[in-house]
C-alpha cells in the first residue's frame, strides 16, 4: 500500500477487471472489497489458525500471481516469530528474480533458485542442525547485508524416483473449512508425469519462457504413471486429473491413455501436447479420458508459425481442431499476434480462413504475444528486431519501484517492434475472432457436417448465420470429400483414389483440379501447399 501507484491500479487496468467480472459473474465492487477487506481478514485468520512459532522453517513456492499473497503472509510470520526461517522457491524465484526478491524483501531468509528436489531437503536439514554456514549450491542467502549465491547447474536427474504428491493436509483442511460442498464431486488432482519440453530441447519456441533453465525433458514411465494415478484416485476419491506437464511424453498416447481406453475407464483428464496429432491419436486420448487439452495452437498463419519455431502448419492445427471436436475434446488455444517480420498477408490469410472454421472451437483469446523472461525473444532480442523497453506495466502498480528493481523480478516485459501490419487488419482479425466466440456462445452455433448415402454424400453447412445450406455431392466429389476426411491428401493421391473407386470412369487431372477448386471455394475443403483436407465432420460415429 506504500506504493504511490497502488490506488490507480483498478482504474489503469479497468478492462481486466471488467473481463474478470464478466467471467466470474461478480461485480467489480466485489473484487475491490476482496482486496480491501477480504485479503486482510484472510491473513488475520491464517496467522491465528496455525501456531507458526512451532516450526523452524516455513516454505513458500510461488508461481505467477501467487507472489504478493505469499510475501504478505511470510512477513507477518517473520514479524511475529523472528526465529522462524522463511524459504522461498518456485518459478517466480528462478534466475535473477530469486536473488532480487531476497535482496528487496528482508524477511525472506533463503531462496531456492531452480529445481528444489536435491537442494531443499539438505537446506532444511542444515537449518534444523544449526549448520547454516555451509549451504547447498542453488540456495541464496543474506550474509552481512550481501546476497550470497553459488548456482547449481545440475538438473534433477532422478525425476522418475519422485512419488505421487501428498494432498492429505490440503483435503483435510478443505473439509474442515467446508470447502467441498459438492462432497468432492468436483475434486481435481494435479499430477506431474514429466518435466521440461522435448520439443523445446530441439526448437525453443521463440516467445516461450517456460522451463527457464530446465528445458531437458524427463518423464516417468507410462506404467509408473498408471500406478501413481491409480493410487491418487483411490486415496482421494477422484477420477479428475490435470497433468501439469508442459508437454506430455508421446509414449503416453498409446501406453497410458491407450491402456485407460482398453480398460474402459471413466476419467476426466487435462493435458498439454503438440498439435500435430493424427486422428487416431486424438481418438485414443479421448477414449482414454482426455476431456480438455492445450495443444499449443497459437496461429493459423504459416509464416507466423515459422517465426515462432512451432514445428507445425495451419493444416495440422485445423486437423487437430476438427478431430478434437469430433471426439468431444475441448481445445484451449489462442491466436497470437505482433510478431517480428509478420506482414499484412499473414493477417489476410487468417481473415480469409476463419469463415471456413466457424464450426470448430474458437480460440479463447487473440492478442499480442507476451515477451517472457527466458524466451529467445528475451535472451536475444536484437536477433529478432525487438527492443525491450521495460518490465510489464502492472509491476509498477503491484511493487514499489523504490524498493524493488522491477527489471530483475519481472517475468513479462514491454517491448517495441517495427510493425508493418495495418492497424485496420489487426482490428478486423480481432473482431472476427470475437464474433466467432459469440456465435459459439449463442443458440446459433455454427455447424458443418456430412452424411454418407449409398452413392453420394450430403453436406449440411450452418456456418453462415443467415442461410444454412444442404448440398448433395455425387461421385466423384463425394469420393474426394471422403478421401480427404481423415487426413490431408495431395492431388496425386486423390487422383489415384478416384481411379480405385471410379467403377471404370476416368477423370483427367484437369477435371479433378476443377472439382477441388470448387470444393475449396465452397469451403468444404481446405487447401494448403498442395494438399486438401475435408473441413466437414462426418455424422457417422464409427470413425
Protein language model regions, located:
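N-terminal [4Fe-4S]-dependent radical SAM core
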Residues: 142-194, 454-473, 519-543
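Flexible loop/turn segments at secondary-structure boundaries
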Residues: 66-68, 94-96, 120, 147-148, ...
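C-terminal accessory regions of radical SAM enzymes
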Residues: 1-4, 140-151, 345-477
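Conserved SAM/AdoMet-binding glycine-rich loop
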Residues: 57, 83-87, 222-332, 337-352, ...
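Long, charge-rich, low-complexity alpha-helical segments
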Residues: 471-543
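Conserved N-terminal ligand/cofactor-binding loop architecture of enzyme catalytic domains
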Residues: 1-44
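Canonical Radical SAM [4Fe-4S] cluster-binding loop centered on the CxxxCxxC motif
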Residues: 183-223
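Glycine-rich beta-alpha loop elements in corrinoid/cobalamin-binding modules
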Residues: 32-155
Amino acid at each position: 500500500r506504500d506504493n504511490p501507484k497502488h490506488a490507480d491500479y483498478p482504474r489503469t487496468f479497468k478492462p481486466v477487471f471488467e473481463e474478470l467480472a464478466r467471467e466470474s459473474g461478480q461485480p467489480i465492487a466485489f473484487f475491490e472489497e476482496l482486496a480491501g477487506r477480504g485479503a486482510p481478514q484472510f491473513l488475520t485468520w491464517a496467522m491465528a489458525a496455525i501456531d507458526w512459532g512451532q516450526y523452524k522453517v516455513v516454505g513458500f513456492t510461488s508461481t505467477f500471481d501467487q507472489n504478493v499473497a505469499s510475501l504478505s503472509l511470510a512477513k507477518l510470520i517473520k514479524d511475529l516469530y523472528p526465529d522462524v526461517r522463511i524459504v522461498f522457491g518456485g518459478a517466480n524465484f528462478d534466475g535473477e528474480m530469486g536473488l532480487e526478491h531476497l535482496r528487496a524483501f528482508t524477511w525472506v531468509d533463503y531462496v531456492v533458485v531452480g529445481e528444489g528436489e536435491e537442494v531443499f531437503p539438505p537446506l532444511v536439514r542444515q537449518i534444523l542442525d544449526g549448520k547454516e554456514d555451509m549451504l547447498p549450491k542453488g540456495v541464496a542467502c543474506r550474509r552481512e547485508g550481501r546476497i550470497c549465491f553459488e548456482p547449481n547447474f545440475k538438473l534433477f536427474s532422478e525425476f522418475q524416483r519422485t512419488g505421487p504428491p501428498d494432498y492429505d493436509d490440503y483435503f483435510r483442511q478443505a473439509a474442515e473449512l467446508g470447502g467441498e460442498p459438492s462432497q468432492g464431486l468436483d475434486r481435481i488432482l494435479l499430477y506431474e508425469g514429466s518435466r521440461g519440453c522435448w520439443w523445446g530441447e530441439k526448437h525453443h519456441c521463440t516467445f516461450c519462457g517456460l522451463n527457464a533453465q530446465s528445458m531437458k525433458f524427463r518423464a516417468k514411465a507410462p506404467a509408473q504413471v498408471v500406478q501413481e494415478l491409480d493410487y491418487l484416485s483411490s486415496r482421494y476419491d477422484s477420477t479428475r486429473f490435470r497433468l501439469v506437464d508442459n508437454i506430455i511424453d508421446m509414449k503416453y498416447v498409446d501406453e497410458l491413455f491407450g491402456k485407460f481406453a482398453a480398460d474402459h475407464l471413466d476419467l476426466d483428464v487435462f493435458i498439454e501436447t503438440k498439435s500435430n496429432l493424427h486422428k487416431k491419436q486424438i481418438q485414443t486420448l479421448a477414449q482414454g479420458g482426455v476431456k480438455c487439452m492445450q495443444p499449443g495452437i497459437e496461429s493459423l498463419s504459416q509464416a507466423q508459425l515459422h517465426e515462432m519455431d512451432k514445428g507445425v502448419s495451419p493444416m495440422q492445427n485445423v486437423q487437430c481442431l476438427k478431430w478434437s471436436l469430433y471426439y468431444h475434446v475441448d481445445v484451449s488455444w489462442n491466436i497470437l499476434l505482433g510478431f517480428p517480420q509478420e506482414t499484412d498477408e499473414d493477417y489476410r490469410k487468417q481473415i480469409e480462413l476463419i469463415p471456413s472454421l466457424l464450426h470448430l472451437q474458437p480460440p479463447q483469446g487473440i492478442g499480442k504475444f507476451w515477451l517472457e523472461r527466458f524466451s529467445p525473444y528475451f535472451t536475444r532480442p536484437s536477433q529478432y528486431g525487438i527492443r525491450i523497453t521495460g518490465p510489464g506495466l502492472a509491476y509498477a502498480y503491484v511493487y514499489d519501484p523504490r524498493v524493488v528493481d522491477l527489471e530483475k523480478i519481472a517475468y513479462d516485459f514491454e517491448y517495441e517492434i517495427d510493425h508493418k501490419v495495418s492497424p485496420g487488419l489487426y482490428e478486423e482479425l480481432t473482431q472476427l475472432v470475437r464474433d466467432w466466440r459469440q456465435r459459439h456462445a449463442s443458440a446459433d452455433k455454427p455447424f458443418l457436417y456430412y452424411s454418407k448415402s449409398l452413392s453420394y454424400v450430403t453436406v449440411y453447412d450452418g456456418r453462415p448465420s443467415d442461410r444454412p445450406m444442404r448440398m448433395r455431392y455425387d461421385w466423384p466429389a463425394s469420393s474426394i470429400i471422403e478421401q480427404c476426411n481423415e487426413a490431408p491428401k495431395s492431388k496425386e493421391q486423390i487422383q489415384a483414389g478416384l481411379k480405385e473407386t471410379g467403377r471404370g470412369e476416368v477423370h483427367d487431372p484437369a477435371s479433378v483440379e476443377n472439382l477441388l477448386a470448387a470444393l475449396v471455394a465452397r469451403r468444404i475443403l481446405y487447401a494448403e501447399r498442395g494438399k486438401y483436407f475435408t473441413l466437414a465432420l462426418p455424422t457417422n460415429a464409427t470413425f
